[in-house]
């Protein structure tokens, strides 16, 4: 080759003549992509975007001036810049004129949006985004103003603050099970034997004396009453009673069943005495012996005598009627 420097980029500006990534594909792959009908976002954006809006690589400005260069390279680069300058301005003017400001192509383009963003936020330098799926048109939405500046990728949805908004009243935490000492347990048991349902002043006084909370004493008495009621129910059911006797009612809001066994034994001893004391109010299921005695004494009562005399009266009347009939027939 006669002039190798015309095709190779100069050493001072290596990125000036470097082609964009979209133009590096072979011709066969480009035709296949253009003929391929796909509904992916990337394909639609690539198809609908004109050539003038393709992103171009802008060379970073070098801070140090060029020190060693030949006059031939400088003249060649200046000639190339002069040739490309009017072409690029004409293409950009032709492409920008038919497209509206709020059109699809203008929205999907990257150069106007990035320029406006740089004008509005000159101090904000967006960090490189690690996902290759988003192009330059989405960069304004993935800036530090929307996401934390410390993270270079999209944060996990759990890190946002909007799911942490209060969804009603906060749930009340469950109380841990209190561990009572032997002294506290004995004092509570002693008070429970005195009164099953402790009043609020006594409960507060007992809690302050034992160094406990009012709620702890209240819960202990509730649990103790439940155990006591279950044991008394078993005793009543075994002795032939019913469960309703242990439950509080309107007439007996605080049932005391501590002497259930004594009461049941006392009732058993008083059963033989019930016929002599109140025979008129005695019920058959309470005094069965008295009921049997009344049945045995029924024949000697005046009601029995009258009832016994009734069949004789009926027989006498029948005989008299028979005699009258005979007399009628004879006459």
Curated annotation (Swiss-Prot):
Residues 315-331 have a biased composition (Acidic residues). GO terms for biological process: cell differentiation in spinal cord; regulation of transcription by RNA polymerase II. Pfam families: Homeodomain. Belongs to the H2.0 homeobox family. GO terms for cellular component: nucleus. GO terms for molecular function: DNA binding; DNA-binding transcription factor activity, RNA polymerase II-specific. This is Homeobox protein DBX1. It is found in: Nucleus. Residues 173-232 bind DNA. Keywords: Developmental protein, DNA-binding, Homeobox, Nucleus. The keyword Nucleus applies. The keyword Transcription does not apply. The lineage of its organism: Eukaryota, Metazoa, Chordata, Craniata, Vertebrata. It comes from Xenopus laevis. SMART domains: HOX. May function within the midpoint progenitor population to inhibit neuronal differentiation, possibly through modulating the function of Xash3. Residues 56-94, 232-331 are annotated as: Disordered. InterPro entries: H2.0_Homeobox_NeuralPatt, HD, HD_metazoa, Homeobox_CS, Homeodomain-like_sf, HTH_motif. Residues 256-266 have a biased composition (Basic and acidic residues). It comes from the Eukaryota. Residues 299-314 have a biased composition (Low complexity). Gene3D superfamilies: Homeodomain-like.
